[in-house]
């Protein structure tokens, strides 16, 4: 990086995104930026002139994976036939933001480093790298990238739409405030316009994204202050849009209006991802979560009162510093009390620069492993039970992709379960199915009737 050697400008690219849905959104927008420059997408990194690794920094394993990928790309290029130049390598995303100039020092093959708030400058960085100039940008200007991104042009039946970025909660284990910055909300009009463009491009379902999405706030087209519920109600009126979802939420920002929207907005799907992280009040306080277990359970009760069939999802961390057996049992207790449709569990991963990384009482890896296995077994049991409870129900399924067998399609239920449907309904259509069987990770449905797209 920055060695002064020029190289041909890339004609093809491949974007590989790690981690959260927002990275998937960012990866798609980077691809659109590069296509707007005349490049075409390659099917794999091996076939691309430019490889963009859109990285995640939330856990050590995810952050380290980027370096193994860089090594693999370099080795494959070295082993390839003569005349095939090594692809240009760009590291984007949260590892880029956190490590910046350290990345090319550790991995000299990296040509470009670009943070998650600066990727709108990727075309210029590619041009700089091709000319042998330094190509690093980890600035965090508030929301300016959205003003320069190209209009959404083509889209599958489901789409992500970032409405909010950053986080001000400063949970003691989390790097997001340092890699994504302070909370910012995109303007109402920009979100509505992008949603319209996504629908025009083929989207039937839109998932609103944010690190703390239910903290979104802004003024509507009449100058009135709105929260996420107001934005959802506006999108509910868009012709052609069939489904709305949002993720990820913080318990402290579940407003009365947002809870009410779950019972009142027809297009808002009955699914809520609301992480609690732990069931012990002592651990929640050490995490700086700003809520307790009882308050979280009251929120779940209120949401279920508004929408009785809602599926609840969550995130859990085991082995946070100082976690005792009693604390872990409190986590199992809150899991049993909520009864999740699905959830994600992780071993605590100390991230440099976060308060938790230097806390006393770091839990032994073997203890974390045992706790994770117990927790995941309980969550798997709950997910399978939730799936079995849908057998015999009739629901709409949005067909998203081909299945493994000829004529088979896979779609999503309102509760975000994968549903396998035979008889080949077209991708992008809403079909009514009877759920006839359920496994731990998917359902099978019998086609009843089909709605026009």
From Swiss-Prot:
It comes from the Bacteria. CDD domains: Radical_SAM (cd01335). Keywords: 4Fe-4S, Cytoplasm, Iron, Iron-sulfur, Metal-binding, S-adenosyl-L-methionine, Transferase, tRNA processing. It holds the Pfam family UPF0004. The keyword S-adenosyl-L-methionine applies. Its EC number is 2.8.4.3. Its main location: cytoplasm. Residues 11-131 form the MTTase N-terminal domain. It catalyses: N(6)-dimethylallyladenosine(37) in tRNA + (sulfur carrier)-SH + AH2 + 2 S-adenosyl-L-methionine = 2-methylsulfanyl-N(6)-dimethylallyladenosine(37) in tRNA + (sulfur carrier)-H + 5'-deoxyadenosine + L-methionine + A + S-adenosyl-L-homocysteine + 2 H(+). Gene3D superfamilies: Methylthiotransferase, N-terminal domain, tm_1862 like domain. [4Fe-4S] cluster 2 binds at residues 167, 171, 174. Residues 388-449 form the TRAM domain. [4Fe-4S] cluster 1 binds at residues 20, 56, 94. Its cofactor is [4Fe-4S] cluster. GO terms for cellular component: cytosol. It is an enzyme of class 2 (transferase). Binds 2 [4Fe-4S] clusters. One cluster is coordinated with 3 cysteines and an exchangeable S-adenosyl-L-methionine. It is found in: Cytoplasm. Transmembrane segments: none annotated. GO terms for molecular function: 4 iron, 4 sulfur cluster binding; metal ion binding; N6-isopentenyladenosine methylthiotransferase activity. Residues 153-385 form the Radical SAM core domain. Catalyzes the methylthiolation of N6-(dimethylallyl)adenosine (i(6)A), leading to the formation of 2-methylthio-N6-(dimethylallyl)adenosine (ms(2)i(6)A) at position 37 in tRNAs that read codons beginning with uridine. Belongs to the methylthiotransferase family. MiaB subfamily. Monomer. This is tRNA-2-methylthio-N(6)-dimethylallyladenosine synthase. The lineage of its organism: Bacteria, Pseudomonadati, Pseudomonadota, Alphaproteobacteria, Sphingomonadales. The gene is miaB.
């Amino acid at each position: 990086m920055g060695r002064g050697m020029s190289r041909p400008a890339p004609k093809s690219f491949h974007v590989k995104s790690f981690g959260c849905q927002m990275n998937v959104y960012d990866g798609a927008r980077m691809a659109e930026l590069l296509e707007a420059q005349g490049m075409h997408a390659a099917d794999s990194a091996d076939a691309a002139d430019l490889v963009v690794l859109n990285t995640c920094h939330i856990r050590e394993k995810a952050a380290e994976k980027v370096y193994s990928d860089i090594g693999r790309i370099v080795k494959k290029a070295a082993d390839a036939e003569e005349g095939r130049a090594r692809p240009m390598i760009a590291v984007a995303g949260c590892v880029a933001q956190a490590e910046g100039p350290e990345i090319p020092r550790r991995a000299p093959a990296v040509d470009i480093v670009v943070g998650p708030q600066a990727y709108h400058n990727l075309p210029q960085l590619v041009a700089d790298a091709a000319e042998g100039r330094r190509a690093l940008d980890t600035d965090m200007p508030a929301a300016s990238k959205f003003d320069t991104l190209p209009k959404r042009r083509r889209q599958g039946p489901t789409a992500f739409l970032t409405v909010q970025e950053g986080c001000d909660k400063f949970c003691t284990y989390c790097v997001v405030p340092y890699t994504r910055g302070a909370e910012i909300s995109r303007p109402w009009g920009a979100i509505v316009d992008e949603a319209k463009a996504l629908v025009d491009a083929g989207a039937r379902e839109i998932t609103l994204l944010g690190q703390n999405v239910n903290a979104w706030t802004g003024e509507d087209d009449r100058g009135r202050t709105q929260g996420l519920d107001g934005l959802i109600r506006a999108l509910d009126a868009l012709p052609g849009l069939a489904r709305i979802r949002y993720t990820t939420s913080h318990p402290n920002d579940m407003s009365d209006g947002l809870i009410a929207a779950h019972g009142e907005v027809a297009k808002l799907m009955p699914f809520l991802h609301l992480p609690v992280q732990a069931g012990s009040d002592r651990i929640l306080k050490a995490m700086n979560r700003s809520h307790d277990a009882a308050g979280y359970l009251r929120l779940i009760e209120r949401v279920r009162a508004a929408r009785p069939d809602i599926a609840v999802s969550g995130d859990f961390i085991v082995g946070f510093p100082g976690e005792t057996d009693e604390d872990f049992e409190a986590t199992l207790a809150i899991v049993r009390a909520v009864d999740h449709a699905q959830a994600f569990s992780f071993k605590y991963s100390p991230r440099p620069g976060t308060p938790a990384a230097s806390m006393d009482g770091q839990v032994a890896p073997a203890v974390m492993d045992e706790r994770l296995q117990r927790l995941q077994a309980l969550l798997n049991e709950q997910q399978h039970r939730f799936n079995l409870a849908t057998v015999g129900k009739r629901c709409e399924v949005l067909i998203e992709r081909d299945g493994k067998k000829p004529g088979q399609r896979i779609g999503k239920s309102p509760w975000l379960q994968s549903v396998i449907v035979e008889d080949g309904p077209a991708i992008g259509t809403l079909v009514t199915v009877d759920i006839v069987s359920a496994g731990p990770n998917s359902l099978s449905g019998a086609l009843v009737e089909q709605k026009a797209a």
